[in-house]
């Protein structure tokens, strides 16, 4: 940001209409609707940003206000903030019967006029023409009034058309326009209305309050583009939405309002796979036949498909309804490809044309956009922002933001992942780096005898036999452990955690950035750090053979692992070794080793086994997830060379048990000390209805019962789900049970009732995260609260305020969820690359053959899980199969007669990764080989 008094003399000289120079004053709607344009490095005019505009953007959209603040702070933009509300000649008072919006528009016009007069006066004695002050607004009435007052004003499109980068900047314009377009309006008037108009906001709010309408988040069906659902609080099952009309322009994650149909009209979810890409392949983005005048036959077919796939199993009926309004859009920029078939072959290369952009997220609809760069963008991943979705339009409209690179290149795929899951990956700015110790990587723990502040109230634990146990190549070592026998027969065990809060002080630029990022994000080939690497992989990392600051939890435990007492202390440690899980396991099991370090690991392991037994006896769940390990080429290419299931050893459990013990102990301490604002983590019990399908599957296909009355009952039931003929069956059931669970979440202790604190999966009445402050911001907050609880330092004011803690919890819950999704998507991408490489390595190139398990049956296909690769896929059939929803099975024709395939069956599949020639999306295609070869049907 530059100060208004430091305005450069003539502003920008490159615009065709203003050769003598100019400045722009955008109104509020320009920032609300054209932020991608303003942020573009190609948009170069100096901007006079009015206080009125800043305040209005803040009230209308906090995310856009955050982006605006970043622009103001950017050194790449010439933005001059003018506090017009405090200037005697530009401040305005709202007039009687004047709306707040009209008052603000009048204030903006007055400021523009004042600046124009001010500049003309300053230029009076110069021979050259004074620069022009240009008011940018897409409000036709505002432009008319400005012109009446002698103010130079242009619409955004008019202004951009005169810039030297107009071809690229015009593509960035949002499809939505405040004033509308006469031609477009006429065209829209001729179109058939496809969707019901949304109810007014006041009607929606009143309806939800009265209970006549219901509110929840929209979820698209991954298997059927004609079906969606809305999770409504208090409903045992989601509200089902069948067909485009019922979903009514909802986009994944939108907060929508639904109207329930009478119970006689309730339906069951789909029992068939309906692929959007195949159904929409022939749509024309620029043809009204693909829009409001879409063929009545096509509409009828879609409605029939939605009905036919729904009501086959009356026992599974659930609340059914339609969307009548949207409370909050979840729209953002989406990673897409240009659909090759939507390009016009008759237009010139530089002509603007309407094309389809297909999002990589299959839960999203195709997006229409106009661009002059369509031919150049083919084959690339691009970023597209959603702007509007009109009732007469089959698809939403958006605008091009920028190109990300060639599809399937690792660089473009990595950036796509980060953007798709909203992972902040910008380099740490100067203000953040200035928070680091000035010594940089030469910082060391000072000698104790110097009496430096680092040693204040810290225990000297450097002589303890401490070690860390982590995955291979771990650089951000958060935790280390020790155990030793005590003279009284008990055992001392310690968990030592990196003292991140010593370096990250509250309400500093580095702290605010860590709070915004929320967590470190781990991709297969890259780590996006929450904190600068100087801290995460060096000064805070508990490396071996160097002294480090720590926060220690130390227990006295009985030989049976009962807690005698626990204490918490700031400390200095010197780790004696950094093991991988495999190295620690080998050391523990080696009978020839009996040194202090090995004895400590064995002692820790014996305690961990007892701690785990106690947890399981209390009802903790032993669930499973399909985790795989990607082996990358050590060369610069980092190509995947193999995929294997992760192997879990005793030492994995050893570390897990002591981290759980530390987290539970710290949770008790901080909740006792700060009952109103303690940062805790909970896992709510899932509704019993979440398990109904799995219970029915187990009973009908295996004769097994699943008791979900409590976590302990569920754990005992899962232990009994054993098939002697299929060793992997129990793991498969545990994976399926995991998917019935709710997600764990961070929360503020004073915001919920005490009865809801518990962690269902761990069977613990209270829990928090303390053990990974290098990579989780929640742990940093827990450290600060624990330090205050033991009297080490006063608690910062921000952690005394419940509303502030609630706000942080909301951010880090979202960041944590998105980070997990980004990590899984990265694994899926590299598994796909590995499969493609294996396909190419085979002589026939026909695909990789693996065992899989059927996890779901449809009328026209099977969903299968390939445990070795940790991936799911669809095997689809076009004809001749017979579907039985009661037995969750398909009967397929075989060479020796019909063969029945049901959920839980082991099958053999051929796997290929194909690239859709239109969308450029990689798609896993599976074909059944055994018990029936489905290649021919």
Residue ranges and their predicted role:
Residues 4-10, 28-31, 237-239, 365, ...:
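Short linear interaction motifs
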Residues 4-134, 140-178:
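Active-site-proximal, substrate-binding regions of enzyme catalytic domains
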Residues 27-34, 50-52, 136-138, 156, ...:
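Structured beta-strand/turn binding interfaces of compact recognition modules in eukaryotic regulators
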Residues 32-34, 39-40, 54-59, 65, ...:
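Eukaryotic short linear interaction motifs
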Residues 36-39, 60-62, 147-150, 158, ...:
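Short coil/turn segments at secondary-structure boundaries
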Residues 90-100, 127-129, 235-242, 366-367, ...:
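Short interface patches used for recognition in eukaryotic signaling and trafficking proteins
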Residues 178-494, 501-546, 890-902, 921-937:
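Charge-lined substrate channels and their catalytic hotspots, especially those that engage the 3′ end
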Residues 362-365, 383, 388-391, 406, ...:
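Electropositive polyanion-binding surfaces
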């Amino acid at each position: 940001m530059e100060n208004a008094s430091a305005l450069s003399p003539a502003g920008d000289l490159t615009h065709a209409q203003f050769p003598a120079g100019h400045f722009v004053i955008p109104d509020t709607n320009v920032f609300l609707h054209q932020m991608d344009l303003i942020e573009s490095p190609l948009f170069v005019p100096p901007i006079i940003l009015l206080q009125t505009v800043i305040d209005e953007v803040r009230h209308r959209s906090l995310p856009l206000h955050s982006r605006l603040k970043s622009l103001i702070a950017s050194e790449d933009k010439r933005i001059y903030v003018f506090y017009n509300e405090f200037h005697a000649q530009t401040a305005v008072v709202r007039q009687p019967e004047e709306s707040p919006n009209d008052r603000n528009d009048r204030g903006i016009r007055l400021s523009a006029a004042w600046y124009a007069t001010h500049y003309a006066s300053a230029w009076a004695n110069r021979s050259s023409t004074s620069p022009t002050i240009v008011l940018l607004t897409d409000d036709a009435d505002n432009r008319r009034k400005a012109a009446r007052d002698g103010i130079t004003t242009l619409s955004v499109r008019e202004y951009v058309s005169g810039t030297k980068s107009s071809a690229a900047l015009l593509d960035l314009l949002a499809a939505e326009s405040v004033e509308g377009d006469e031609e477009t309006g006429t065209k829209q008037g001729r179109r058939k209305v496809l969707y019901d108009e949304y109810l007014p906001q006041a009607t929606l709010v009143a309806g939800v309050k009265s209970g006549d309408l219901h509110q929840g988040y929209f979820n698209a069906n991954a298997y059927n583009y004609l079906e969606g659902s809305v999770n409504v609080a208090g409903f045992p099952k989601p509200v089902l939405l069948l067909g485009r009309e019922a979903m009514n322009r909802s986009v994944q994650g939108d907060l929508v309002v639904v109207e329930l149909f009478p119970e006689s009209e309730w339906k069951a979810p789909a029992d068939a796979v309906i692929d959007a890409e195949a159904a929409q392949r022939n749509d024309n983005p620029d043809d009204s036949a693909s829009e409001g005048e879409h063929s009545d036959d096509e509409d009828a077919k879609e409605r029939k498909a939605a009905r036919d796939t729904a009501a086959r199993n009356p026992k599974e009926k659930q609340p059914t309804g339609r969307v009548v309004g949207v409370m909050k859009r979840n729209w953002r920029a989406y990673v897409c490809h240009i659909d090759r078939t939507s390009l016009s072959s008759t237009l010139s290369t530089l002509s603007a044309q309407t094309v389809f952009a297909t999002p990589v997220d299959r839960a999203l609809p195709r997006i229409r956009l106009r661009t002059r760069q369509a031919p150049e963008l083919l084959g690339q991943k691009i970023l597209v922002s959603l702007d509007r979705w009109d009732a007469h339009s089959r698809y939403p409209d958006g605008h091009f933001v920028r190109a990300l690179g060639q599809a399937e290149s690792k660089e473009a795929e990595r950036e796509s992942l980060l953007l798709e899951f909203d992972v902040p990956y910008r380099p740490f700015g100067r203000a953040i780096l200035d928070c680091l110790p000035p010594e940089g990587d030469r910082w060391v723990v000072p000698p104790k005898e110097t009496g430096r502040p680092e040693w204040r109230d810290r225990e000297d634990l450097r002589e303890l036999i401490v070690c860390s146990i982590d995955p291979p190549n771990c650089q951000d070592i958060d935790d280390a452990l020790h155990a030793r026998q005590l003279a009284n027969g008990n055992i001392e065990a310690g968990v030592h955690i990196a003292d991140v809060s010593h370096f990250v002080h509250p309400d500093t630029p580095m702290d605010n950035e860590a709070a915004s990022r929320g967590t470190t994000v781990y991709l297969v080939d890259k780590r996006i750090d929450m904190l600068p690497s100087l801290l995460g992989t060096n000064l805070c990392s508990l490396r071996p053979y160097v002294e480090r600051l720590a926060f220690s939890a130390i227990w006295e435990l009985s030989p049976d692992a009962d807690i005698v007492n626990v204490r918490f202390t700031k400390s200095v440690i010197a780790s004696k070794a950094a093991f991988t899980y495999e190295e620690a396991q080998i050391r523990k099991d080696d009978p020839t080793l009996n040194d202090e370090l090995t004895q400590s690991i064995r002692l820790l392991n014996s305690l961990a086994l007892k701690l785990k037994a106690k947890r399981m006896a209390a009802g903790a769940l032993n669930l499973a997830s399909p985790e795989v390990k990607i082996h990358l080429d050590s060369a610069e290419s980092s190509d995947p060379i193999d995929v294997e299931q992760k192997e879990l050893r005793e030492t994995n459990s050893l570390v897990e048990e002591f981290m759980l013990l530390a987290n539970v102990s710290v949770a008790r301490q901080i909740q006792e000390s700060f009952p109103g604002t303690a940062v805790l983590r909970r896992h709510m019990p899932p509704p019993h209805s979440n398990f109904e399908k799995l219970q029915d599957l187990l009973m009908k296909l295996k004769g097994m019962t699943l008791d979900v009355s409590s976590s302990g009952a569920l754990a005992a039931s899962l232990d009994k789900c054993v098939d002697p003929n299929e060793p992997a069956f129990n793991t498969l059931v545990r994976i399926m049970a995991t998917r019935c669970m709710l997600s764990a979440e961070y929360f503020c202790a004073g915001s919920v009732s005490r009865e809801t604190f518990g962690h269902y999966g761990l069977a613990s009445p209270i829990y928090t995260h303390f053990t990974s402050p290098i990579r989780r911001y929640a742990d940093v907050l827990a450290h600060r609260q624990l330090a205050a609880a033991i009297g080490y330092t006063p608690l910062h004011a921000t952690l005394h305020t419940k509303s502030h803690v609630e706000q942080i919890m909301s951010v880090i819950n979202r960041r944590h969820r998105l980070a997990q999704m980004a990590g899984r998507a990265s694994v899926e991408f590299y598994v796909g690359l590995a499969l493609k490489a294996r396909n190419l390595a085979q002589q026939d190139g026909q695909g990789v053959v693996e065992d899989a398990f059927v996890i779901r049956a449809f009328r026209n296909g099977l969903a299968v899980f390939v445990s070795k690769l940790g991936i799911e896929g669809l095997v689809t059939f076009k004809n001749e199969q017979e579907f039985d929803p009661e037995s969750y099975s398909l009967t397929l024709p075989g060479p020796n007669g019909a063969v029945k395939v049901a959920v839980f069956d082991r099958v053999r599949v051929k796997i290929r990764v194909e690239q859709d020639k239109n969308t450029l999306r990689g798609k896993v295609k599976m074909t059944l080989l055994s018990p029936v070869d489905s290649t021919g049907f």
